[in-house]
Structure formats: structure tokens, C-alpha cells
């Protein structure tokens, strides 16, 4: 009988299916890894926007984590939207009793319109309780600014931001350069800072509005590859290659920013 690596996503639910838990489980399935989930909040959203965010109780979040702990052998996991300080503290405390393997944190903190999704208390909890325990952080540029106060716009400022993140206990990070008005050239750069290497992943930009869930999908692809035995550097590089293929092959669903086309990478995994 074939054994499938087991992974976990701790994140919010997207009723539109393009981001959050739904995007994570689709990415896991594409890789042939078995995805489990802990839902932190329910969102009412579609391709045109988020219409409501409803955090779950800390009791329900804790119960989900412990249920996964008691029955599954998790090889790697990711965290996405954690909603508020209470849920962040709950997750941090519960994880101290778990062995879920390597952790990828996609710090969902800033909305597309630039509004902060986490209050200051929650950001402080995230910095103190979760950043030092994370094996890989995958922030976009607005999230880098929220965490460090540094506007990362080029190699020098990205390196400066990483210095601040390292002071906060971050070991490895992918600073994603595609989520900003400042980069509208032919290529988009992601800055990768690992404990033993630093490099840039550059990919051609594509003219598409169907990019909802790119951050969730990238972190989930990395988790799936880690669970299959790749090291961090190769998992990040391969995930970026796959995400580029996905964006090249848009999925026209809904009337706004459509979801990603995970079917497009079936033959590449």
C-alpha cells in the first residue's frame, strides 16, 4: 500500500475557493500529499473581494490542532491567516505539544487595499510567539513593512529587512517582490534568505488578473515539496517554478481576481 506524506494547513476558509484552506488543500492534492486542516476563521468572499471575516473560538482552534496531533504523522505544515492575538497565542501554545515537522509561515497581515488585517497586539504576538519557531517565513512586501518598518524595494533594502527579521528570530525567508506597485517591470523578483545561502528568484510577469491565492499556493507548494523530502532551497526553487507555470495558465472563474489553475502543473509534479 502506498504511503502518502501527511501535511497540515492552519489558516482561514475562503468561500470562493481561491485562497486559504481551500487553496492549500488543492496544492497538497496536486503533489500527492495528504492534507489536513485547522480552520482559524471563516471568510465570506469571492473573486470580487472579502465581504466578512468571522474568527473561530480559541477552543475550537485548539481542539482541531490536538485532533490532528493525536492521529496523524505530519511531515510539514504551514500557517496562514491567524486573525487575532487570541488565536495566535492559542496556536503557539498548542504547537508546543506537537511535532509537526518543518513550519512555513505565510503571515497574512495586509489586505489588497493596504489595510492591516491584524491589530497591533496580534502583530506583537506573532513576532514573539511564532516567528522564532518558524523554519521559513514567506511575506510579501507590505507584510515585510508591517513586521520590520522597512520598505523593501531592491536588493539592499530587502537585505536590510531580513536583518530586522533575523533579530526577531527568523531563520529563513522568501521576501516576495510581486505584490507591490513599485515593481512593474518585465520581471518580478523574490529575495531568498537562508541560513546558508542568499539568492534571487526572478520570473517574468504575466498580464493577468487571475492571481487570487498566489501567496497561499506558494507556501503550500513549498510544504508539499518539503514533505516529499526536498531540502528548503530546492523546495523553494521548485515551488517558484511551478507557481510561474500556474500564473501562465490562468483560470477564468468569477468576475474579479480569479483563482489559480492548479491543473496546469499536473504533468510537472
UniProtKB/Swiss-Prot annotation:
Disulphide bridges: none
InterPro entries: HMP/HMP-P_kinase_dom, PM/HMP-P_kinase-1, Ribokinase-like
Pathway annotation: Cofactor biosynthesis; thiamine diphosphate biosynthesis; 4-amino-2-methyl-5-diphosphomethylpyrimidine from 5-amino-1-(5-phospho-D-ribosyl)imidazole: step 2/3; Cofactor biosynthesis; thiamine diphosphate biosynthesis; 4-amino-2-methyl-5-diphosphomethylpyrimidine from 5-amino-1-(5-phospho-D-ribosyl)imidazole: step 3/3
Coiled coil: none
Highest rank taxon of the organism: Bacteria
GO BP terms: thiamine biosynthetic process; thiamine diphosphate biosynthetic process
GO cellular component: cytosol
EC number: 2.7.1.49, 2.7.4.7
SUPFAM superfamilies: Ribokinase-like (SSF53613)
GO molecular function, one term: ATP binding
Binding-site positions, 4-amino-5-hydroxymethyl-2-methylpyrimidine: 45
Catalytic function, reaction form: 4-amino-5-hydroxymethyl-2-methylpyrimidine + ATP = 4-amino-2-methyl-5-(phosphooxymethyl)pyrimidine + ADP + H(+); 4-amino-2-methyl-5-(phosphooxymethyl)pyrimidine + ATP = 4-amino-2-methyl-5-(diphosphooxymethyl)pyrimidine + ADP
Keywords: ATP-binding, Kinase, Nucleotide-binding, Thiamine biosynthesis, Transferase
Function: Catalyzes the phosphorylation of hydroxymethylpyrimidine phosphate (HMP-P) to HMP-PP, and of HMP to HMP-P.
Family of the protein in this entry: Belongs to the ThiD family.
NCBIfam families: HMP-P_kinase (TIGR00097)
Protein name as catalogued: Hydroxymethylpyrimidine/phosphomethylpyrimidine kinase
Organism this protein belongs to: Helicobacter pylori (strain J99 / ATCC 700824)
Annotated gene: thiD
